[in-house]
Amino acid sequence: YKTNEVYLRAAIESILSQTFTDFEFLILDDCPDESREKIIASYSDERIKYTKNSCNLGISASRNKLIDMAQGEYLAVFDHDDISLPERFAKEVAYLDANPQCGVVSCAFKKLIENTVNVNPENNEQITRKMFISCALLHPAAMIRKSVLDNLNLRYEEKFSPAEDYALWCRMIDKTEFHNLPEVLFYYRDHAQNTTHNQLQKMQDRTCFIQAFARINNAALWKGIEQQIRYVTYIKVFGIPMFKIVSCGQYSKCYLFDRITIYYSKTKVII
């Protein structure tokens, strides 16, 4: 959808260069454009199956259409402007094969624009804990066991867009296990035109709703985790950050100008 030709070619070629070769490459164009169709047609690889929507369906509906089309055991998610390193599929497939209890595996990744490496928590317990606070799996780098989605009747939901991936993960918290490979196998193109940047406020609003949903639906698990989370709040007076409140479980501290402790409590904060 509205993809830069250079980015699209780099994305396609990164998939065709995978060392693991037994896959079908499903490409769906949500807003068909003749120039993009010509780009895709220029790759004479029988694994490519190109389809296009007759009208714009949006991210969630398009992803669900691809899930229903897919014939494979695993679904390797991928966006139109990112890059999968050659060993990504091989290593994610190997992990899922060796760990049948795991429904989703992702990996460490590098942000191309910032030139920074991001490593999320690795094991299921750590990922689940973080999922209540923020998304702990990079979606376009993830590989999903299709049977988990089918058996639980799970799909992406448009009402959570553009955070539909985070919502899907949160609905899977008590249904399967997650894992992040520590190796960088993916390059994420975090540029001004991608969905996260274009819909930032909507993303933040949906994220808050998803977190509340996850905490309510996993109340017992969240209760144990909440006691260990450290919250930091700054209070400004006439635009100056004067007070800093640090809370963790039953304990709270209030600092003046981030240095002087002016209040400590095991139960609450009073200013």
Segments from the language model and where they lie:
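Acidic donor-binding segment of Leloir-type glycosyltransferases
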Residues: I12-C55
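Short aromatic/hydrophobic "clamp" motif used to bind/position activated sugar donors
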Residues: L75
